[in-house]
Amino acid sequence: MARGDGHLWTETYDSSTVAFMILGAALVFFMVPGLGFLYSGLARRKSALALIWVVIMATLVGILQWYFWGYSLAFSKTATNNKFIGNLDSFGFRNVYGKISDDSTYPELIYAIFQMMFMCVALSIIAGATAERGKLFPHMVFLFVFATLVYCPITYWIWAPGGWAYQWGVLDWAGGGNIEILSAVAGFVYSYFLGRRKENLLINFRPHNVSMVTLGTSILWFGWLLFNAASSLSPNMRSVYAFMNTCLSATTGGMTWCLLDYRSEKKWSTVGLCSGIICGLVAATPSSGCITLYGSLIQGIIAGVVCNFATKIKYYLKVDDSLDLLAEHGIAGVVGLIFNALFAADWVIGMDGTTKHKGGWLTHNWKQMYIQIAYIGASAGYCAVVTAIICFVLGKIPGVHLRVTEEAEALGLDEDQIGEFAYDYVEVRRDYYQWGVDTDALHTTCNGANSASETNPTEDSQNSSLSSATVSGQNEKSNNPKLHHAKEA
């Protein structure tokens, strides 16, 4: 048929499956702003907006990379003789408009979109490594190269029919290796190359907005439910089971971390609660479609304990992993993959009606443990080495040095890299100190207003408050050497 004659699509698909996957892709994407709010709240105020920006921009980079050659490298159907990486047969989303296989009930295009959102989440997690000291443009260059050389090969290993891990029988339901461990190791290595933040700037450091941390965690949990459930690729019993497993693991993970923090601080920590929930969600990522419900209860407890203590690793290795990517994503991902070897059951895996697997130790498949461990080691090792090479090479190229200057770090990434601020009133207050205010003129204005107070007592009260605030601010300015220094600068 010639072009322009009118073409009617004759392929038929199951509408419920297509709708399920579209909804799943949308909710996985919704995790991206959740990560942005989480990271922003955990950082200091002067870099709050930069972390939201870098997470969103990481998603844009990921979408472009996936469209050009990412999907083809990760899921090529014609690279059956290559167990490491796909080819460019689907470059630019070519040949992805039919069924992904003869017996599939959905078009390959929706599968490509769904997997694209998974990579966007992985890149957004890594973006947190730039916290308070990383340049933004070089990080975007890093993410594009990283997605090509690291994410696509490891994803091909585990999810493409030609990958060695897929053929070996590794159990990784929704990305414990190619998303969680990969993003954690990459973020940790990137933090190493960035170097530590200035110690004098970390005195009395604490998250600037715990409410935003809580909001981000809630959004993540909401999106994570379909992140795991929709990995069944159809609305079946296995997706329902994965949904419940995700909730159980997050619940016990949050409770466990919170109790551990209370044991040492004798206070209930909201940040600790959110950290534990995230650890439980991460652990459920590779296991929620494979293990039993009571296994998820135990998994959340183990993840909460192990990840809580794993936050100390960065101090021993002297790496400024400011957002604890290694502990909360890497170690939790390892826990989930190990639990697949322990608690995976053949009857859980078979709930989708199509997948056959012997399960783990629970169903007497003893060799599953070394298969899982080998996959963990291969994913983490390959990611660490290639990420280090990418960071080293980029650091030698003029214009793409990874770290900002000391002055920019002290000023904050919002002002140095963005030019906008998460909280304008903070910058108005700073400008007030730098510009200075004529207090004599303000006193004259306020005294004139006082003479009219008999006719308008409300206005008198407001002017008095303004006068007090102004004088107080001037006194603070005159007694604070840091503000004098800022004005001179």
Swiss-Prot record:
Gene Ontology CC terms, in alphabetical order: endoplasmic reticulum; plasma membrane
InterPro entries: Ammonium/urea_transptr, Ammonium_transpt, Ammonium_transpt_CS, NH4_transpt_AmtB-like_dom
Annotated keywords: Ammonia transport, Membrane, Transmembrane, Transmembrane helix, Transport
Membrane topology: Multi-pass membrane protein
Protein location: Membrane
Segments passing through the bilayer: 18-38, 49-69, 109-129, 140-160, 174-194, 210-230, 240-260, 268-288, 290-310, 331-351, 373-393
Extracellular-facing ranges: 1-17, 70-108, 161-173, 231-239, 289, 352-372
Regions of this protein lying in the Cytoplasmic compartment: 39-48, 130-139, 195-209, 261-267, 311-330, 394-489
Biased composition (Polar residues): 448-481
Region spans: Disordered: 448-489
UniProt-recorded Gene Ontology molecular function terms: ammonium channel activity
Signal sequence range: none
GO biological process terms, semicolon-separated: ammonium transmembrane transport; nitrogen utilization
Role summary: Transporter for ammonium (both charged and uncharged NH3 and NH4) to use as a nitrogen source. The affinity of MEP2 is about twenty times higher than that of MEP1. MEP3 has the lowest affinity.
Family to which the UniProt record says this protein belongs: Belongs to the ammonia transporter channel (TC 1.A.11.2) family.
Note: Present with 3820 molecules/cell in log phase SD medium.
Full protein name: Ammonium transporter MEP3
Organism per entry: Saccharomyces cerevisiae (strain ATCC 204508 / S288c) (Baker's yeast)
Name of encoding gene: MEP3
